[in-house]
Amino acid sequence: MTQKERRIFLIEYLLRENPNYHGVQIPDDEDEQKILLRSLMNVRPPQHTSKEFLRIQDNYLQEAIRQHGITGLADLKPVTGRGNGDWYVWRGDITTLKVDAIVNAANSGMTGCWQPCHACIDNCIHTFAGVQLRTVCAGIMQEQGHEEPTGTAKITPAFNLPCKYVLHTVGPIISGQLTDRDCTLLANSYTSCLNLAAENGVKSIAFCCISTGVFRFPAQKAAEIAVATVEDWKAKNNSAMKIVFNVFSEKDEALYNKLMS
């Protein structure tokens, strides 16, 4: 099957399984088809999926990521003068990064972003991992029986992403003036991810900028906490785990490079 044939199959499957979509027309434009498919995946509840759907979805997503370009750890340049070549700052799409684990800035529901085509990292990771990720996360949350507390972490397979695992953590939401508790909770998110990564044999991990987006944690302070917390954890655990700070903007890239220079 071509990518177009896969995309049409997936859209038709998702439209058929929900009677509310009766009458929805599939657009001819490729970009509009991609938007429709992503939207349908983003709002789809965790439920049974046919083996045929999963096979075609997996082929489609893996090819889409391959076309976008996969970045491996060997493609990154270590930060000079820090550690033993095990610290990196990288600006790019975390869903294309081939490391052992990537970190997802999740919400307390832990089942991904339900807003169609939202640009948050939670949405991107769930979209390109595939519908299996929401199903697995929903199972974890059902067994847990309550929302995910701030500063903790869960680990799942990465499914169609180039990495092996996704670590999901809920960072603090800033609604007013930044407090010491906010800073402690953010540090806890980093520590929880590192502990869980080590328990699962992870040798390389990529952190997004936890809490700095819609959760409104100030970027400068968040970066300081991130670097200090990871550095402290590596020292206490005598760890050679490779650390990638994945950033979105040139400003954040400069900020992390300055902190680690």
Swiss-Prot record:
UniProt-annotated binding residues for Zn(2+): C113, H118, C120
Function: ADP-ribosylhydrolase that specifically reverses the SirTM-mediated mono-ADP-ribosylation at an asparatate residue of GcvH-L, by releasing ADP-ribose from the target protein. May play a role in the regulation of the response to host-induced oxidative stress.
Catalytic activity: 4-O-(ADP-D-ribosyl)-L-aspartyl-[protein] + H2O = L-aspartyl-[protein] + ADP-D-ribose + H(+)
Record-listed ADP-D-ribose binding positions: D93, I94, N107, C120, I121, D122, S211, T212, G213, F215
Keywords (A to Z) from UniProt: Glycosidase, Hydrolase, Metal-binding, Zinc
Domain of life of the source: Bacteria
Signal sequence interval, chain numbering: none
Organism: Treponema medium
Record PANTHER family: GANGLIOSIDE INDUCED DIFFERENTIATION ASSOCIATED PROTEIN 2-RELATED (PTHR11106), MACRO DOMAIN-CONTAINING PROTEIN (PTHR11106:SF27)
PROSITE patterns xref list: MACRO
Keyword Nucleotidyltransferase: no
GO molecular function terms noted in the UniProt entry: hydrolase activity, acting on glycosyl bonds
Family: Belongs to the MacroD-type family. Zn-Macro subfamily.
Protein name: Protein-ADP-ribose hydrolase
Cofactor(s) the protein needs: Zn(2+)
Macro domain span: 74-261
EC number: 3.2.1.-
Cofactor binding: number and manner: Binds 1 Zn(2+) ion per subunit.
